[in-house]
């Protein structure tokens, strides 16, 4: 059984008054356990060293760190595969931005597109096979949970990858990626206990900050696949 593991966090507010004008999902992707464990060790070591230097024992969130300290955490795991999807909020219809359910649907759609883009790249590069069964484990910060959103998002990812159905692009049918069974585990986690979600918070904030500071170099990341919507 093939396995791919994703970790995600977000940055920005999905609202027309968001000061950067953008909403970002970003995170890390692993195709084997040994690489994931190595990344986790590196991030934990960098995290502990920074906590010691700062005299802190709470969770280190990007919003409460200086650019220098965020950079040190980012550098600890920058060699690993990562992904992001950035939503240009100025191009999102008001009727979507004005309804909580519509916002949740669009955010799920964005996350699904991001995952599909990476899976397509993994197939094209020969890292995974489209004809073998596969399990996706997707770890997301629990604060991103939408009411009744778990099964909608999980089932939607399976449909998109295995059957080629898109529920948001009305009237458009996307080709399926896999000619095999796709299993999805969607897990909402407390970021306090998940270091790769903490690393994803740093990454998402870096991409979001690139729009605030108008510094495109912050988005120049090796081994990274970036998607922009709509």
Regions found by a protein language model. Name each.
Residues 1-230:
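Phosphate-ester processing/binding pockets and catalytic centers
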């Amino acid at each position: 059984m093939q396995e791919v593991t994703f970790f995600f966090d977000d940055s920005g507010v999905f609202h027309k008054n968001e000061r950067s004008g953008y909403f970002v999902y970003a995170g890390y992707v692993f195709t084997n356990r040994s690489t994931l464990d190595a990344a986790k060790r590196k991030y934990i070591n960098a995290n502990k060293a920074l906590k010691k230097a700062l005299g802190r024992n709470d969770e280190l969130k990007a919003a409460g760190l200086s650019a220098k300290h965020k950079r040190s955490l980012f550098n600890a795991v920058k060699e690993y595969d990562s992904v992001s999807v950035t939503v240009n909020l100025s191009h999102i219809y008001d009727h979507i931005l004005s309804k909580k359910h519509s916002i949740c649907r669009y955010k799920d759609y964005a996350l699904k597109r991001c995952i599909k883009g990476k899976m397509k790249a993994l197939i094209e590069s020969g890292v995974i096979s489209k004809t073998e069964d596969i399990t996706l484990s997707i770890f997301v910060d629990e604060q991103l949970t939408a009411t009744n959103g778990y099964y909608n998002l999980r089932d939607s990812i399976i449909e998109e990858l295995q059957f080629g159905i898109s529920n948001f692009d009305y009237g458009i049918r996307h080709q399926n990626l896999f000619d095999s069974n796709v299993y999805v585990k969607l897990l909402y986690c407390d970021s306090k206990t998940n270091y790769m979600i903490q690393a994803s918070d740093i990454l998402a904030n870096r991409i979001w900050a690139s729009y605030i500071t108008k510094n495109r170099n912050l988005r120049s990341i090796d081994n990274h696949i970036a998607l922009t919507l709509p």
